[in-house]
């Protein structure tokens, strides 16, 4: 099944391709500039997907908004994750803010919300989380964003150290894309039954 995936983030595009192809989707990528003015990940994902509606017809349009929520920071950076620091040094700022937080209070989770605008303009949304902790120093060379400082529950290496094959089978983005793919497959199978 062909879908449009809206993103200007090359790392998200790579992950989405690696996740969606085995799920049976042929993603077409569309870069649309959209101000993220929503108060939630879901609101921002909907804004991004709707921004691409005029660009394509008769194909579901999917968009992602995701970020990290740190319990010791009252859920921040949250929807501000990609623009947490003014100079793009998001990890440095996060680690500085967490410098005195003991291990027991370094819990965090990634959130990924996926919005899909159907050809009939109906909007579907799903969200998923990936629980873990914030490390004291970056670890690993893979991934992107906050991956080097996120230690997923049940693992001994950061998300950046997992390798893309494993990360793309357990991450928040994988879980959300899997949920959306199931929803789309059910929708299309019932329409064509």
Curated annotation (Swiss-Prot):
It comes from the Bacteria. InterPro entries: dITP/XTP_pyrophosphatase, ITPase-like_fam, RdgB/HAM1. The keyword Metal-binding applies. SUPFAM superfamilies: ITPase-like (SSF52972). One of its GO terms (cellular component) is cytosol. Keywords: Hydrolase, Magnesium, Metal-binding, Nucleotide metabolism, Nucleotide-binding. Substrate binds at residues 7-12, 66, 144-147, 167, 172-173. It catalyses: XTP + H2O = XMP + diphosphate + H(+); dITP + H2O = dIMP + diphosphate + H(+); ITP + H2O = IMP + diphosphate + H(+). Its cofactor is Mg(2+). Mg(2+) binds at residue 65. Belongs to the HAM1 NTPase family. Pyrophosphatase that catalyzes the hydrolysis of nucleoside triphosphates to their monophosphate derivatives, with a high preference for the non-canonical purine nucleotides XTP (xanthosine triphosphate), dITP (deoxyinosine triphosphate) and ITP. Seems to function as a house-cleaning enzyme that removes non-canonical purine nucleotides from the nucleotide pool, thus preventing their incorporation into DNA/RNA and avoiding chromosomal lesions. Homodimer. This is dITP/XTP pyrophosphatase. It comes from Tropheryma whipplei (strain TW08/27).
């Amino acid at each position: 099944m062909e879908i449009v995936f809206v993103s200007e983030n090359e790392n998200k595009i790579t992950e989405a391709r690696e996740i969606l192809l085995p799920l049976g989707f042929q993603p077409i990528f569309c870069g649309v500039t959209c101000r993220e003015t929503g108060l939630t990940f879901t609101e921002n994902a909907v804004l991004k997907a709707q921004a691409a509606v005029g660009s394509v017809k008769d194909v579901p349009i999917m968009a992602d908004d995701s970020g990290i929520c740190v319990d010791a920071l009252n859920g921040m950076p949250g929807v501000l994750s990609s623009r947490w620091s003014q100079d793009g040094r998001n990890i440095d700022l996060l680690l500085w803010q967490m410098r005195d937080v003991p291990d027991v209070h370094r819990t965090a989770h990634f959130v990924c919300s996926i919005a899909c605008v159907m050809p009939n303009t109906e909007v579907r949304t799903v969200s998923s989380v990936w629980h873990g902790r914030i490390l004291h120093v970056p670890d690993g060379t893979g991934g992107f964003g906050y991956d080097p400082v996120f230690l997923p529950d049940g693992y001994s290496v950061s998300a950046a150290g997992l390798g893309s094959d494993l990360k793309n089978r357990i991450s928040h983005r994988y879980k959300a894309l899997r949920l959306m793919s199931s929803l789309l497959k059910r929708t299309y199978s019932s329409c064509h039954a």
